[in-house]
Amino acid sequence: MKNLHSLFLASAFLAGFCGSSLAGEREGVVVSIKPLHSIVSAVMQGVGKPKLIVQGAGSEHVYSLKPSDAEAIEHAKVIFWAGPSMETFLDKPIDTLGEGAKVVALGDAKGLTKLKFREGGPFEAHDHGHGGSHEEEHDAHGSGDHDHAAEVAEEGHEHHHHGEYDLHFWLDPQNGKILAADIAKTLGESDPEHAAQYEKNAKAYGEKLDALTREVAAELKPVKDKPFIVFHDAYQYFENRFGMKAAGSITVSPEKAPGAARIQQIHDKIKSLGATCVFSEPQFEPKLVKTVVDGTKARTGVLDPLGAELKDGPDLYPQLIRNLANSLKDCLPK
């Protein structure tokens, strides 16, 4: 069985170098993470369903590619992802297994609101890399055999660099509207027969997101100026859209544990600002958050930038935005 598994991985890996001539005609749509998959799903309603790579409570920061993921990338006609600075695990596989596919980095979509990384003071300076060595990441994935596709993904992981812009752009629902239109255009070019349907779906989804933006803005109005601390600095697009303001983040990268000095700095920040809530994330161990709030009056809450516990599909993205608003509203004092 193990030999068959190895044979499959070797075949998939080699197929990437040989191109689509060996893989056959490409078909299907692959999307990296749940929020983007949700938007693509909405645009594709009535036509088809895209394949999701990072499923469940997985995080793009520490994900290892599975054989089924490698196969999907190998045969995909269109691949959507945020971009190489976000899903570093996909960079190498897309270059090899995805050769011949239409690859779209949605972080490059025209018209997006784009925000630079926050650095200094309460926001730990970015090293413009995901941080951590290859060995540390391997430990984060857990013990056990590493498949070849995962090794391809990790080969360039520690060498990849952030750009100057924060790539959590989907947390602004108005960016979600722009993404839907961009996705519809790409799909229409690859599948002209259904171009009108994609465009219609994107327009309807955009109107839904306009209504959502108004709804969330009204809900958050009572807590707009209340300081809070986040696990890692992923939410400034949401904050910028709705007038919220995080007072700081515990760590710059979820896979990189902060030192004692950093924890003490945030602890002092909570006390000096009177921050009433510190938010963890469902994808990561909340122990750090508990350590930070120990000895303060701050409560803990959960913010989920990916929709870890939400059902995949077109409704995930609007619900993700609502859940962020609800978590903030429930934890912060009115």
From Swiss-Prot:
Disordered: region residues: 120-147
One GO CC annotation: periplasmic space
Keyword NAD on entry: no
Signal peptide: 1-23
Residues noted as binding Zn(2+) in the record, renumbered to the chain: 60-61, 168, 232
Transmembrane segments: none
Subcellular compartments: Periplasm
Record-linked Pfam families: ZnuA (PF01297)
Molecular function GO labels: metal ion binding
Cystine bridges: 277-331
Protein's GO biological process: zinc ion transport
InterPro entries assigned: Bact_metal-bind_prot9, ZnuA, ZnuA-like
Disruption phenotype: Mutant strain (znuA delection) is attenuated in infected mice, showing decreased splenic CFU. Also confers a protective efficacy similar to that of RB51 and S19 vaccine strains.
Protease recorded as keyword: no
Role summary: Part of the ATP-binding cassette (ABC) transport system ZnuABC involved in zinc import. Binds zinc with high affinity and specificity and delivers it to the membrane permease for translocation into the cytoplasm. Required for survival and normal growth under low Zn (2+) concentrations. Also required for virulence and intracellular growth in macrophages.
Protein family according to the UniProt entry: Belongs to the bacterial solute-binding protein 9 family.
The protein's name: High-affinity zinc uptake system protein ZnuA
Species of provenance: Brucella abortus (strain 2308)
Taxonomic classification: Bacteria, Pseudomonadati, Pseudomonadota, Alphaproteobacteria, Hyphomicrobiales
Gene: znuA
